[in-house]
């Protein structure tokens, strides 16, 4: 590699304000997106706190509970409460992302 090309590469790296930490433009974009998503989720949590009880339950509990009860009615296990509890615990991740 010619010295001029190496110098050009170094100036490009120096133009990036986070280059001293080794962050690329893609990583910077990802970090910015994560910050924005975190701000949105914190705003949503505040909104959930201000909702009336019925609306809060409709947005958070009812969707997973209805799905769990449908599976419970279909399978009719001998211990329905334990079945429903384990179903809710196993499937909570897919519903937490929606809130």
Swiss-Prot record:
One of its GO terms (molecular function) is identical protein binding. Residues 1-26 are annotated as: Disordered. The modification Phosphoserine is found at residue 19. There is a cross-link at residue 35 (Glycyl lysine isopeptide (Lys-Gly) (interchain with G-Cter in SUMO2)). GO terms for biological process: endosomal transport; transcription initiation-coupled chromatin remodeling. The keyword Signal does not apply. Pfam families: Dpy-30. The modification N6-acetyllysine is found at residue 35. Coiled coil: none annotated. The keyword Protease does not apply. The modification N-acetylmethionine is found at residue 1. GO terms for cellular component: Golgi apparatus; histone methyltransferase complex; MLL1 complex; MLL1/2 complex; MLL3/4 complex; nucleoplasm; nucleus; Set1C/COMPASS complex. It is found in: Nucleus; Golgi apparatus, trans-Golgi network. Keywords: Acetylation, Chromatin regulator, Golgi apparatus, Isopeptide bond, Nucleus, Phosphoprotein, Transcription, Transcription regulation, Ubl conjugation. Belongs to the dpy-30 family. Homodimer. Core component of several methyltransferase-containing complexes including MLL1/MLL, MLL2/3 (also named ASCOM complex) and MLL4/WBP7. Each complex is at least composed of ASH2L, RBBP5, WDR5, DPY30, one or more specific histone methyltransferases (KMT2A/MLL1, KMT2D/MLL2, KMT2C/MLL3 and KMT2B/MLL4), and the facultative components MEN1, HCFC1, HCFC2, NCOA6, KDM6A, PAXIP1/PTIP, PAGR1 and alpha- and beta-tubulin. Interacts with ASH2L; the interaction is direct. Interacts with ARFGEF1. As part of the MLL1/MLL complex, involved in the methylation of histone H3 at 'Lys-4', particularly trimethylation. Histone H3 'Lys-4' methylation represents a specific tag for epigenetic transcriptional activation. May play some role in histone H3 acetylation. In a teratocarcinoma cell, plays a crucial role in retinoic acid-induced differentiation along the neural lineage, regulating gene induction and H3 'Lys-4' methylation at key developmental loci. May also play an indirect or direct role in endosomal transport. This is Protein dpy-30 homolog. It comes from Homo sapiens.
């Amino acid at each position: 590699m010619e010295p001029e090309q190496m110098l050009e590469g170094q100036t490009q790296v120096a133009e990036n304000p986070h280059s001293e930490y080794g962050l690329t433009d893609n990583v910077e974009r990802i970090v910015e997106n994560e910050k924005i998503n975190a701000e949105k989720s914190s705003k949503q949590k505040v909104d959930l706190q201000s909702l009336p009880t019925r609306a809060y339950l409709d947005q958070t509990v009812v969707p997973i509970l209805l799905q769990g009860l449908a599976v419970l009615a279909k399978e009719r296990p001998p211990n329905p409460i334990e079945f429903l509890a384990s179903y809710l615990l196993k499937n909570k991740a897919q519903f937490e992302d929606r809130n």
